[in-house]
Amino acid sequence: MAKDDVIEVDGIVKEALPNAMFRVELENGHVVLCHIAGKMRMHYIKILPGDKVKVELTPYSLDKGRITFRYK
């Protein structure tokens, strides 16, 4: 899949789940199940409930996503 096929939206982490999964509420009100991108996992970036994050969604599955950035 090409990089320009993704949809990037901001959201707030609502819940931390097992296996580095998170429930994120997007700006438009939808709740998405997300995992952490590999680069964030490699650099030990911690994500806690309440953090504002950037999420990538694919056009094929809008209920799952990947957290690519945590805002300060």
UniProtKB/Swiss-Prot annotation:
Domain of life: Bacteria
Gene Ontology CC terms: cytosol
UniProt keyword annotations, A-Z: Cytoplasm, Initiation factor, Protein biosynthesis, RNA-binding, rRNA-binding
Keyword rRNA-binding: yes
InterPro entries: NA-bd_OB-fold (IPR012340), RNA-binding_domain_S1_IF1 (IPR006196), S1_domain (IPR003029), TIF_IF1 (IPR004368)
Molecular functions (GO terms): ribosome binding; rRNA binding; translation initiation factor activity
SUPFAM superfamilies in alphabetical order: Nucleic acid-binding proteins
Domain S1-like: start-end pairs: 1-72
Disulfide bonds: none
Entry's localization field: Cytoplasm
Primary location recorded for the protein, binned into one broad class: cytoplasm
Keyword rRNA-binding on entry: yes
Subunit composition and interactions: Component of the 30S ribosomal translation pre-initiation complex which assembles on the 30S ribosome in the order IF-2 and IF-3, IF-1 and N-formylmethionyl-tRNA(fMet); mRNA recruitment can occur at any time during PIC assembly.
Main function: One of the essential components for the initiation of protein synthesis. Stabilizes the binding of IF-2 and IF-3 on the 30S subunit to which N-formylmethionyl-tRNA(fMet) subsequently binds. Helps modulate mRNA selection, yielding the 30S pre-initiation complex (PIC). Upon addition of the 50S ribosomal subunit IF-1, IF-2 and IF-3 are released leaving the mature 70S translation initiation complex.
Family: Belongs to the IF-1 family.
Protein name: Translation initiation factor IF-1
Gene designation: infA
